[in-house]
């Protein structure tokens, strides 16, 4: 007797949970932009704020703690509220393969509750990725300190953490931008990060990257970044990849030595083997030797000339394999740093007789000593760094 077996692959269940006011705004924005195949959840202590949410599932946290009010910018209240409803959080996340936790760090509910939600998700075996923003500078030093502590706690309970500093928006939008447009752009960036990663999973392509690949690259990796680049013309592959890597809206993290890398190339039928190779070669230059690299392609028949590249790099900060050498090319007066003997470090000692020599003699001696120590190999090592990354370092 034959038994019919359903061999149709099941799509990964992906959910996005926005926590607090900032997370709720981001979820509303994502739902409006029609990111397909994702279920949206909003969690907040403020019952009034939840009334304006369009997400399919809303979760009021800690009604016994806050009585339906907000957390009053107190992360401890947000944490207690989430702890009160741990079972309900687990219930709405049940059966999920991957969850994005998004919030604006620095407030009460988002900062306090997000680590608790992440801990619950991880306990259920869910691939847990947080995409959060740091406050704008004008929001105050106190809020920034609260955000930093919240990010530290959140990092302990997620597989990968993408941090987006709102300060970068000021550089891009300019100081004349309205407050509403600034916060709307922050929501755009959060939505873009979620869409970029989910599309890698959801969109099938000629060279496919599936959920298992994403899980391998993003599990237990810590600090991560996500960037997208678009380009057209004869050098579109290289330009799009470099644009994705140096995305100005992402945190200032060192890409050198990334341990996990996901790349998705989306282009029309005219995508060439050489362009595919160009993308891979650029990625290889900043990946560690042991990095898990997955490059997928999606052919969109409607695309003409333009090429899109999405890069997700994880496990950042471990750069032992290919250390990045930063060279300071800032011109300084000769011997300026040698006007006084160097401050001792470790077991070094100061020769106080040096102070008896005129400054001009000390400077001349220091300049000669520095010239004698120049190692030509240093310059050769520097050339191992991709040109566009050297320009960033300079």
Curated annotation (Swiss-Prot):
<dbReference type="GO" id="GO:0032153">
    <property type="term" value="C:cell division site"/>
</dbReference>
<dbReference type="InterPro" id="IPR003008">
    <property type="entry name" value="Tubulin_FtsZ_GTPase"/>
</dbReference>
<dbReference type="InterPro" id="IPR008280">
    <property type="entry name" value="Tub_FtsZ_C"/>
</dbReference>
<dbReference type="InterPro" id="IPR045061">
    <property type="entry name" value="FtsZ/CetZ"/>
</dbReference>
<dbReference type="GO" id="GO:0005525">
    <property type="term" value="F:GTP binding"/>
</dbReference>
<dbReference type="InterPro" id="IPR036525">
    <property type="entry name" value="Tubulin/FtsZ_GTPase_sf"/>
</dbReference>
<keyword id="KW-0132">Cell division</keyword>
<keyword id="KW-0131">Cell cycle</keyword>
<feature type="binding site">
    <location>
        <position position="139"/>
    </location>
    <ligand>
        <name>GTP</name>
    </ligand>
</feature>
<dbReference type="GO" id="GO:0051258">
    <property type="term" value="P:protein polymerization"/>
</dbReference>
<dbReference type="InterPro" id="IPR018316">
    <property type="entry name" value="Tubulin/FtsZ_2-layer-sand-dom"/>
</dbReference>
<comment type="similarity">
    <text>Belongs to the FtsZ family.</text>
</comment>
<dbReference type="GO" id="GO:0043093">
    <property type="term" value="P:FtsZ-dependent cytokinesis"/>
</dbReference>
<dbReference type="GO" id="GO:0000917">
    <property type="term" value="P:division septum assembly"/>
</dbReference>
<dbReference type="InterPro" id="IPR024757">
    <property type="entry name" value="FtsZ_C"/>
</dbReference>
<keyword id="KW-0547">Nucleotide-binding</keyword>
<keyword id="KW-0963">Cytoplasm</keyword>
<dbReference type="Pfam" id="PF00091">
    <property type="entry name" value="Tubulin"/>
</dbReference>
<keyword id="KW-0717">Septation</keyword>
<protein>
    <recommendedName>
        <fullName>Cell division protein FtsZ</fullName>
    </recommendedName>
</protein>
<keyword id="KW-0342">GTP-binding</keyword>
<feature type="binding site">
    <location>
        <position position="187"/>
    </location>
    <ligand>
        <name>GTP</name>
    </ligand>
</feature>
<dbReference type="InterPro" id="IPR000158">
    <property type="entry name" value="Cell_div_FtsZ"/>
</dbReference>
<dbReference type="GO" id="GO:0005737">
    <property type="term" value="C:cytoplasm"/>
</dbReference>
<comment type="subunit">
    <text>Homodimer. Polymerizes to form a dynamic ring structure in a strictly GTP-dependent manner. Interacts directly with several other division proteins.</text>
</comment>
<feature type="binding site">
    <location>
        <begin position="21"/>
        <end position="25"/>
    </location>
    <ligand>
        <name>GTP</name>
    </ligand>
</feature>
<dbReference type="InterPro" id="IPR037103">
    <property type="entry name" value="Tubulin/FtsZ-like_C"/>
</dbReference>
<feature type="binding site">
    <location>
        <position position="143"/>
    </location>
    <ligand>
        <name>GTP</name>
    </ligand>
</feature>
<dbReference type="InterPro" id="IPR020805">
    <property type="entry name" value="Cell_div_FtsZ_CS"/>
</dbReference>
<feature type="binding site">
    <location>
        <begin position="108"/>
        <end position="110"/>
    </location>
    <ligand>
        <name>GTP</name>
    </ligand>
</feature>
<comment type="function">
    <text>Essential cell division protein that forms a contractile ring structure (Z ring) at the future cell division site. The regulation of the ring assembly controls the timing and the location of cell division. One of the functions of the FtsZ ring is to recruit other cell division proteins to the septum to produce a new cell wall between the dividing cells. Binds GTP and shows GTPase activity.</text>
</comment>
<dbReference type="Pfam" id="PF12327">
    <property type="entry name" value="FtsZ_C"/>
</dbReference>
<dbReference type="GO" id="GO:0003924">
    <property type="term" value="F:GTPase activity"/>
</dbReference>
């Amino acid at each position: 007797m034959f038994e019919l077996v359903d061999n149709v692959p099941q799509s990964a269940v992906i959910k996005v949970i926005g926590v607090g006011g900032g997370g709720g705004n981001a979820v509303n924005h994502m739902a409006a932009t029609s990111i397909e195949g994702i279920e949206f959840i909003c969690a907040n202590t403020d019952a009034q704020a939840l009334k304006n949410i369009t997400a399919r599932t809303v979760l009021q946290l800690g009604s016994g703690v806050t009585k339906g009010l907000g957390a009053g910018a107190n992360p401890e209240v947000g944490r207690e509220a989430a702890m009160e409803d741990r079972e309900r959080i687990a219930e709405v996340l049940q059966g999920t393969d991957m969850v994005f936790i998004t919030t604006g760090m620095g407030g009460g509910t988002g900062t306090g509750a997000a680590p608790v939600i992440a801990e619950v998700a991880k306990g259920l075996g869910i691939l847990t990725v947080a995409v959060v923003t740091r406050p704008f500078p004008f929001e105050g030093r106190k809020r920034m300190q609260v955000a930093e502590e919240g990010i530290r706690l959140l990092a302990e309970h997620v597989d990968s953490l993408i941090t987006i500093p709102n300060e970068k928006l000021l550089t891009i939008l300019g100081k004349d931008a309205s407050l509403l447009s600034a916060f709307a752009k922050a929501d755009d960036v959060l939505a873009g990060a979620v869409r970029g990663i989910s599309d890698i999973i959801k969109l099938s392509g000629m060279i496919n990257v599936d959920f298992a690949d994403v899980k391998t690259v993003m599990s237990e990796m810590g600090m991560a970044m996500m960037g997208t680049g678009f380009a057209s013309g004869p050098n579109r592959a290289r330009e799009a990849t470099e644009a994705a890597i140096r995305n100005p809206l992402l945190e200032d993290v060192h890409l050198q030595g990334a341990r996990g890398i996901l790349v998705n190339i989306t282009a029309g039928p005219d995508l060439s083997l050489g362009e595919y190779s160009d993308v891979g070669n650029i990625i290889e230059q900043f990946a560690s030797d042991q990095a898990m690299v997955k490059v997928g392609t999606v052919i969109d028949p409607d695309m003409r000339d333009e090429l899109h590249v999405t890069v997700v790099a994880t496990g950042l900060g471990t750069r032992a394999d290919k250390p990045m050498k930063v060279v300071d090319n800032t011109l300084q007066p000769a011997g300026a740093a040698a006007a006084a003997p160097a401050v001792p470090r470790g077991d070094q000692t100061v020769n106080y007789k040096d102070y008896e020599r005129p400054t001009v003699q000390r400077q001349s001696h220091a300049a000669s000593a520095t010239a004698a120590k120049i190692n030509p190999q240093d310059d050769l090592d520097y050339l191992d760094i991709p040109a566009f990354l050297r320009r960033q370092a300079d």
